[in-house]
From Swiss-Prot:
Species of provenance: Arabidopsis thaliana (Mouse-ear cress)
GO molecular function, one term: carbohydrate binding
GO biological process terms, semicolon-separated: defense response to insect; jasmonic acid mediated signaling pathway; response to jasmonic acid stimulus involved in jasmonic acid and ethylene-dependent systemic resistance; salicylic acid mediated signaling pathway
Name recorded for this polypeptide: Protein PHLOEM PROTEIN 2-LIKE A5
Annotated effect of mutating residue 116 to I: In strain: cv. An-2, cv. Bs-1, cv. Bu-0, cv. Chi-1, cv. Co-1, cv. Cvi-0, cv. El-0, cv. Gr-3, cv. Ita-0, cv. Jl-3, cv. Kas-1, cv. Landsberg erecta, cv. Lisse-2, cv. Lu-1, cv. Pi-0 and cv. Sf-1
């Protein structure tokens, strides 16, 4: 992609002929990446019947408009940042267009940092930064275009990302498994089946019935109820059906809707690899309920647990707190602080971020790790995202049990 003369310098991907779901557009740069990492990623996506597009055109300039149309027809974009990503102005132009479609709620972006640290991209440092400024010197873009390039880079870096650090021991094949899992999770939100046919849904409205069940009562006064949640009709949309879901109501709190997102419904890096995590049934469960599983960290050099929740299910004008429910066996590998992050729907508000010392949470009882707080209002209707992660320490961590995330009123 450092010019229009060779296939090796092309920024993106190949076409799968399996028309089974939303198209996935892959934006990347580099001959080495194409022959190495992409040789694992593309077949893995196709194996799961995921429709993938990778641009193979040699003469990029002639096909750029058509390529932009293809991006617009896609539902998911995988933006794969590597050290050589900024060697191509085609890649940067693609990224700008991808961001535009994301801002229009027409595209969901999954940023992937391949053998690259997030801060290197955000701060434009290291070889990645050198390549970016070399690109600027070479093409001398207009100030407006340069602003679009940097704005696209910084905006994408703020999204929930999959990161393979530069010196990580995790193999490309294992990293690909996490990417495929993330794509499949996003795909599930795009469609529902009616009479055997798939119908694509708008991103702003959940596509299927949501069931949120907390398997353990918060206290002796709590009871489980089933309710219907009537969604308001959004502008330029057809009436939206009611959605039935379950949650616990704490009778000691008049407004006490307590939501619990199980570990199985969170995104946990490497959780399907038995070398890193194992899934265990939660002890002392009610035999009449479906089995709830907890995740146990056996061994991993980095931690990444994240999830999302739609605030439309919450009580309006109520202060809520978000907490991870965990317990930790005694172990010395947790000497590096673990980071917590809460992103609210109103993008103009900065994410809530903090760090915690996991030694404070060593216990044989379930403990809450606070992530952040927010008040429900018309201004922040939409999806919140939360994460607990540690990507910097190369020590192999273990001994962490993850039960889930609780979202509850704070009084």
């Amino acid at each position: 992609m450092s010019g229009a003369s060779s296939v090796s310098s092309i920024c993106s991907s190949n076409v799968s002929l399996i028309p089974t779901g939303p198209q996935v557009f892959i934006n990347f740069r580099g001959k080495d990446l194409r022959k190495g990492f992409m040789s694992f990623l593309k077949p893995a996506l196709k194996k799961e019947k995921i429709n993938v597009f990778i641009d193979e055109q040699e003469e990029r300039g002639k096909y750029l408009i058509s390529l932009f149309d293809t991006i617009g027809e896609s539902k998911i974009a995988l933006v794969i940042f590597s050290e050589g990503y900024c060697e191509s102005h085609w890649c940067m132009d693609e990224l700008v267009k991808i961001k535009e479609y994301m801002d229009q709620n027409r595209l969901i972006i999954i940023p992937i940092f391949y053998r690259l640290d997030l801060d290197v991209v955000k701060d434009l440092t290291g070889k990645f930064g050198d390549n970016f400024w070399d690109l600027v010197d070479k093409y001398q873009p207009e100030p407006k275009k340069l602003h679009k390039w940097t704005e696209a880079l910084f905006s994408v870096c703020e999204l929930f990302s999959l990161i393979l650090p530069k010196h990580s021991d995790i193999s490309d094949r294992d990293f690909v498994k996490s990417i495929v899992k993330a794509v499949k999770k996003v795909q599930k939100n795009f469609f529902q089946r009616r009479n055997g046919e798939i119908e694509y849904q708008d991103f702003s409205v959940p596509a299927c019935k949501l069931t949120i069940t907390m398997h353990e009562s918060p206290n002796e006064e709590a009871v489980q109820v089933t309710v219907l949640n009537e969604f308001y009709q959004m502008k330029n949309q057809s009436p939206v059906p009611s959605y039935e879901f379950k949650f616990w109501v704490d009778l000691t709190r008049p407004k006490g809707n307590v939501f619990m997102i199980d570990a199985r419904d969170l995104s946990i890096a490497w959780s399907e690899d038995s070398n890193h995590w194992t899934w265990l049934p939660l002890p002392n469960q009610n035999s009449n309920e479906s089995v709830m599983e907890i995740a146990f960290l056996k061994s991993a050099s980095w931690l990444d647990v994240a999830g999302k929740f739609d605030t439309r299910y919450l009580t309006p004008r109520t202060r809520y707190e978000v907490v991870f429910v965990v317990k930790l066996e005694y172990t010395f590998e947790w000497e590096t602080l673990v980071k917590l992050k809460l992103d609210l729907p109103n993008t103009w508000e900065k994410p809530q971020e903090q760090s915690v010392d996991m030694f404070d949470y060593i216990s044989d009882q379930w403990l809450d790790i606070p992530v952040g707080e927010f008040t429900t209002s018309k201004k922040n209707v939409g999806e919140i995202s939360f994460a607990m992660y540690e990507h910097e320490c190369q020590l192999w961590k273990s001994g962490l049990f993850v039960k889930g995330v609780t979202i509850r009123p704070k009084y």
